[in-house]
């Protein structure tokens, strides 16, 4: 039988639910607060676990098929970290959205606000590495490990706890659509 830690056993049903849905904040765009670029601790990170459960620190999660995907420029204020030059909608989505859709999405998510006077602009540049498919097809495990070390160092530097990439999959299903992110033997 698996043993449940006393700290977990002591959680209320509400706190356990918060732990499972992540950093959802109904006062910060509702559902939009959990879709990409949703971290308040590391600007541009994909999301984080909740900060609302006492004695459980939040975990920051970043994605990116070619290294960490974080905002390059950002500022911090009392509400958290905010990207400069980006909206709450990930840039990769913008290419597929019409101008009216972008307008309403920015309206819904709070748009692209710049820093107030006196806020210091900060920078976080991440190393670009080849996508998972290219790394796997090199059959060079030492090189793959080196790329992992690079990303791991940057995760420590920027305060990211979990990297949501690359995945491991075979490319036999066309329904996936994100095959470029996977380690695989299939070209």
List each model region and its residues.
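Glycoside hydrolase catalytic-domain context in secreted enzymes
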Residues: 1-187
């Amino acid at each position: 039988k698996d043993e449940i830690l006393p700290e977990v056993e002591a959680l209320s049903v509400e706190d356990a639910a918060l732990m499972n849905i992540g950093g959802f904040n109904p006062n910060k765009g509702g559902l939009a607060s959990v879709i990409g670029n949703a971290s308040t601790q590391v600007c541009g990170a994909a999301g984080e676990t909740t900060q609302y459960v006492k004695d459980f620190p939040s975990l920051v999660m970043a994605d990116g098929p070619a290294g960490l995907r974080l905002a390059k420029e950002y500022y911090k204020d009392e509400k958290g970290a905010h990207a400069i030059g980006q909206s709450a909608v990930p840039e990769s989505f913008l290419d597929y959205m019409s101008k009216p859709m972008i307008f309403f999405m920015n309206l819904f998510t709070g748009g692209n606000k710049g820093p107030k006077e006196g806020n210091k602009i900060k920078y976080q540049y991440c190393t670009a590495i080849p996508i998972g498919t290219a790394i796997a097809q090199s059959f060079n495990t030492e090189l793959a490990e080196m790329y992992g070390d690079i990303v791991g160092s940057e995760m420590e530097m920027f305060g990211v706890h979990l990297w949501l990439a690359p995945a491991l999959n075979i490319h036999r299903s066309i329904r996936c659509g994100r095959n470029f992110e996977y380690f695989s033997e299939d070209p």
